[in-house]
Amino acid sequence: MESNCVQFLGNKTILITGAPGFLAKVLVEKILRLQPNVKKIYLLLRAPDEKSAMQRLRSEVMEIDLFKVLRNNLGEDNLNALMREKIVPVPGDISIDNLGLKDTDLIQRMWSEIDIIINIAATTNFDERYDIGLGINTFGALNVLNFAKKCVKGQLLLHVSTAYISGEQPGLLLEKPFKMGETLSGDRELDINIEHDLMKQKLKELQDCSDEEISQTMKDFGMARAKLHGWPNTYVFTKAMGEMLMGKYRENLPLVIIRPTMITSTIAEPFPGWIEGLKTLDSVIVAYGKGRLKCFLADSNSVFDLIPADMVVNAMVAAATAHSGDTGIQAIYHVGSSCKNPVTFGQLHDFTARYFAKRPLIGRNGSPIIVVKGTILSTMAQFSLYMTLRYKLPLQILRLINIVYPWSHGDNYSDLSRKIKLAMRLVELYQPYLLFKGIFDDLNTERLRMKRKENIKELDGSFEFDPKSIDWDNYITNTHIPGLITHVLKQ
């Protein structure tokens, strides 16, 4: 094991999937900034050809704000030269054998050159179509494993999963692997091949349906299969099956599985507050800031397990450094905060309310949006009752008026009905996390932190991933929400 992460990355050829996703970009920036002597980074991008892959690299990676520190340090021309020298954009798709690569010479070259494989590719939609979820999160993970096993210099496969494959279990949740066929329902057996066959059969039944009907039916089918086996949604179910396949078929390839919790904006590197897209917590924050969150389903005492993106990347690099070349190893790391530095939804609610009271968003009319703290309801029954009294009864009255006077309120009825259905569906999707009662044990991750401290050479804290260092009030109010407003809302 090499004790120094920067030295470890030097002269390595690395394959990274999942670009241009949020976490993959943070990882690429980190490597280029701290170890420009990395030999090569193969960056797998979903694209039909090399030209399209290069265009995605330029527009979705090279030109974004995340790289402004490197851009300022090196200058635009030197940064572009570094990226051209070190990054090889590869058009591909992990849901296809050999990662969807078509150039046989390129495949052979990659198999002969690659030292480390980092799989971040995933679909994270909770209610993803079952065929897509299986293709990417389950069998895509197996395709990456099979590709990695053919890399003659392959020292390690690092796979990014999610801590929430634990389902809705309460208590202390351990860093342990899933056994093939294990379920969370307890009284059922899971056969991944049967799940694949059922998915294919369902698609065959839908071949004469519209695209919209196929999409919705496959989403509902995935949710039904997940709940049958004890998982709350298609995302975590398909990720769990992906872990099972990797564990069973890894042979002697060193396998590290990183299970992050809810990933948030960067806390330190390359600069505080960078984020892309609305994550789980962010949808709540934005709705609150826009004055749309009058009532919300959550347990004020439940721990919301958050972890900044740069800490996840630091843990990934530290784990890769620790286990590279450890033949036969399968190591699992929870990367989160609930065990060492928990923050509750009630605290997050207070931080958010205080922020927008002092610094309100500006509405379309140019005036500050005045927000009220709103009501938190801690059970689905309470929330359903609230929705019935506040919205559904008025909707029924509007429906009756629409029947009697069909020309008067038809648009209002349809619009309100659609919004209520969407709100209830979102609440049902997020409910397992808003009322979550589990705490993610991070004993393995703590041992990794201790090992790094014993051998520490990165004295500047450039590979910090200890959640105890986070001041949640300061981070949420001075880093995360401002970053969200700047980089996502563009205000």
Curated annotation (Swiss-Prot):
Please give the Pfam families that the UniProt record associates with this protein: NAD_binding_4, Sterile
Keyword annotations of the record = Lipid biosynthesis, Lipid metabolism, NADP, Oxidoreductase
Q: What induces it?
A: Induced by wounding and salt stress.
Q: Does the keyword Lipid metabolism apply?
A: yes
- What GO CC terms are in its UniProt record? chloroplast; plasma membrane
| Keyword Chaperone attributed | no
EC class of this enzyme? oxidoreductase
What EC number(s) would the UniProt record show? 1.2.1.84
Which processes are annotated in GO (biological process)? lipid metabolic process; response to salt stress; response to wounding; suberin biosynthetic process
| Gene Ontology molecular-function annotations | alcohol-forming long-chain fatty acyl-CoA reductase activity; alcohol-forming very long-chain fatty acyl-CoA reductase activity; long-chain-fatty-acyl-CoA reductase activity
Give the catalysed reaction(s), semicolon-separated: a long-chain fatty acyl-CoA + 2 NADPH + 2 H(+) = a long-chain primary fatty alcohol + 2 NADP(+) + CoA
Distribution of this protein across tissues and organs: Expressed in the endodermal cell layer surrounding the central vasculature in roots. Expressed in the hilum region of seeds. Expressed in lateral root tips, cotyledons, the shoot apex, young leaves, petals, stamen filaments, and receptacle of siliques.
Task: List, alphabetically, the InterPro entries matched.
Answer: FAR, FAR_C, Far_NAD-bd, NAD(P)-bd_dom_sf
Reported function: Catalyzes the reduction of fatty acyl-CoA to fatty alcohols. Catalyzes specifically the formation of C18:0 and C22:0 fatty alcohols. Provides the fatty alcohols required for synthesis of suberin in roots, seed coat and wound-induced leaf tissue. Provides the fatty alcohols required for synthesis of alkyl hydroxycinnamates in root waxes.
Q: Which family does it belong to?
A: Belongs to the fatty acyl-CoA reductase family.
Q: What is this protein called?
A: Fatty acyl-CoA reductase 1
What species is given as this protein's source? Arabidopsis thaliana
From which lineage does this chain's organism come?
Answer: Eukaryota, Viridiplantae, Streptophyta, Embryophyta, Tracheophyta
Gene coding for it: FAR1
